[in-house]
Amino acid sequence: MDKDELFLTIGTMIVSDPEILAVEWDALSFVCSIDPGHRQMTGYCYAGDEWEGAPLGDMVFGAMNPLQELQDAMAAETGNRWKQALIHITRPGPEIDIQFEYDDPRRWSPK
């Protein structure tokens, strides 16, 4: 898959997860850390002025696989592997935006 297809796959897996479908949300955000032998994901659901931890169902956490593919593809192009990805999905749409952190492996991690 190319990078655009991987972005679409990641977003589709997240918004199609039954646990995500069961909650009201205007926006979702996920901080994903991928290092050799280690994967971690933290997520939040936003509805109006309210927020709560996002459910990490099988499809949401399964999005780590295409995210790993995306990391590999980007590293093959640039020679540099990112440490974290910040996934932000908003409604209406939904629209997906993914930002990447190459230096600080804890930049977006909960404090």
Language model regions located:
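Contiguous interface-forming segments/domains that mediate binding rather than catalysis
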Residues: M1-K111
